[in-house]
Amino acid sequence: SIVTNLSGVSAGGLVAYTKLVTPILNSSFALALGLYVNNLLPGITVKAIAVVGICILFVLNLLGMDIFAKVSKILSTILLITMVLYVVFGLTQIKQPIFQFSGDKMFTGGFKGFMLAALLLINSANGYYNILWYGKDAKKATKDVPFASMACVPCLLFIYVGLAMVTGGVLPHDEVAGAPTILPAAQAILPGAVYKIFMIGGPIMAIITTLNGVFNDVRYPLAQAAKDGWLPKFILKENRFGAPYLIYTYTLIVVLIPIVTDMSIVTITNIFQVITFFMNVTVVYAISRLPKRYPEAWAKNKFHFSNGALYTFC
């Protein structure tokens, strides 16, 4: 609705239909969950864990927003505490020259490897954007949503940079390069029992919290698209807990398809980037039109800055 209002009907339709395929990204998170749990339970395949995990979260989200919010708070708190403790401890264990940028171990994958790593990082740090979809249910949307979104920045900087430094600094390059997870580094510096606790409270919890939000991240855009006439209105049907079960079921199917067809995490990520590039450009262009479409409201905005600064930011 926002994009349609600011940029026209065609732009709104592009965003609406793009949202039909964006859940595919969460297939990579489900597979990552499988990789981590498989390290604790090697008798269960990665694919089976991924499928069962996303199905459990699907059922959980069918129980309504209240359950979703309570579970998210608990899981996120455990995750934050675990990651901060691991980074703080891990920084004291660094033995490799991680800041020797001219060394032969830097940028071994060349420009292509660097860009692929950057794309993976972007995909892992887009939660701040998805907070926007919760504005409808927020008690003080104009205050809480911007604050929550901006609060993600320092958290991401500390945790992601810290994890990268620890993972690349505690073991020789050859032992961690190309590793699909941060587990080799964690296993090297943590005692056995502590390592397993870290696995559950850190990586596994991080993936679960991400997957837990996928259904609601898709719910609001698709529901609004249906209300605006882009999608059939029957998908708005809700169960007795207020959950749009048809939208959730569709989301589940989209997430499961790449898993059961054995797509790699990198392939899923690249597909997602191509699909969402045009949507993101459309959204940014719409934002740049705010001063022209709503000059008075823009001038009174709490986060107001000059038009030139807005265009530069966009």
Language-model features and meaning:
Residues S1-L62, P203-Q224, S264-F278:
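Hydrophobic transmembrane alpha-helices that form the core helical bundles
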Residues S1-G8, N39, K70-K73, W133-F147, ...:
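Short amphipathic alpha-helical coupling elements at transmembrane boundaries
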Residues S10-A16, K47-V52, K70-L80, F114-A117, ...:
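Alpha-helical transmembrane segments of integral membrane proteins
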Residues F234-Y245, N280-C314:
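C-terminal membrane-solvent junction of multi-pass transporters and transport-like membrane proteins
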